[in-house]
Amino acid sequence: VLTADRPAILRKTGANQTTEQARIYGKAVRYFADIDGPVFPMELPFDSLRSGPVHLNVQFDEPMLPDDSDKWLDEIVISAKVFENRAKPSTLKSDSNRGVLVIGHDRGGLSVESVRKFAKELGWPIIAEDPLSFPDAVAHASIFLTSAQIRAALIPQTVIVIGRTTLSRSINAFLKLAPTQVVIDPRMATVDGDRHADKRFTQLPVLNTHKASPEWLEQWDKYALRCAKSIDALTGFTEAVIAKEIAANLPEGSTLFVSSSRPIRDLEGFATPRSGVTTHANRGLAGIDGNISTALGIALASKQTFAVLGDLSFLHDLTGLIHREEINCSFIVINNDGGGIFSTLPQRGVDGFESVFGTPHSLDPAAIAKAMGISATTISSVDELKKTLKAPVKGISIVVANVPSRDENADSLKAIYESMNSI
């Protein structure tokens, strides 16, 4: 993060447009520098840092224009460094043949490839918050595990969790049933040091484990197939159906950014696991701000990018659409006129719900996009959605999917969850 600042000498003097913004991100960044001039020794910290956010606060003083010298600022050269990890990975020992591997959406920062390799060697059922990165994951686990009966039938001996699970209460309820929990997350060495588990690893360990028994695998397959049958039978242009169809029809080799709140949870639950798509999401504070800008930044490095946003996420970052770069990104905006996730939570129906939680805006996202010079259309059917996903992504476009009301969606989800008790 680069921030522009007034000279330090003006701080705490009441000077205009001057505030305390040094170390504004606190311990959330790996490195901070308060840069007070063109000569600053940044090569050393840049070469030695682990991956993570960096904050450079750059002080600007008069004169604002360069002098007569053509080269008034030396180039910063950051050479690639190779660090040898002298510590051998620890070994994970387990006699369990009824184990489960649970993979959080961000994988604790570990690469998809390394986690896939680990999962294949382990040979346990996989629950993945990002089913588009793990084709061997159990389909729709967060849906059928809403049933307490099914959770009781699938109590594991051991669960291994990679990263953090932040999307579904059903998955977290399932995790609590396991007598032994193993956590793998590099962030425990930095920002997540209080994480509780029976065993903790900050890197993928060497495995000394047993494969899952055939009977255990068959149990998971049974519930996944029964749940998939129910999901395949869903009709209409609902948020669940949209998530299912987006996952199934994204072009091979495309990139997907998915916003927080309901979109990422619907994809987790209703998408059929597959490969061929590179997925991204903001799972730090999981906010709805900055999602357009994040998607466009990702699209700069991708051939064709799709971004799935809720209407509030879209409205909170409209200025991100003001750009001068050539970017290929198709935004699919799920429009239910407000914060749909809150209608699925216990506070639904309390006094003042709409003004505090629902926050309806009564705006037309497509009209707003057009006013900003962006190509925009509105769709209301699965066929139109499939057509959108098959079309080449050229430039920036907005496709607004108008869906049933937030209450209707919440009732539909509740009915789906309740039906899991009888599959």
What do these predicted ranges mean?
Residues 1-2, 27-74, 151-180, 360-423:
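Structural signature of the thiamine diphosphate
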Residues 2-28, 271-423:
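Thiamine diphosphate
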Residues 4-43, 128-224, 324, 345-346:
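Glycine-rich, acidic loop regions that bind phosphate or pyrophosphate groups
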Residues 35-38, 57-60, 102-108, 129-131, ...:
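Structural motif
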Residues 45-50, 89-99, 118, 245-252, ...:
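Glycine-rich phosphate/diphosphate-binding loops that line cofactor/substrate pockets in enzymes
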Residues 93-109, 217-237:
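Active-site donor-nucleotide binding/catalytic segment of nucleotide-sugar enzymes
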Residues 103-186, 190, 273-304, 315-319, ...:
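Glycine-rich, anion-gripping cofactor-binding loops and their flanking helix/strand elements
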Residues 221-302, 421:
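Active-site diphosphate/adenylate-binding microenvironment
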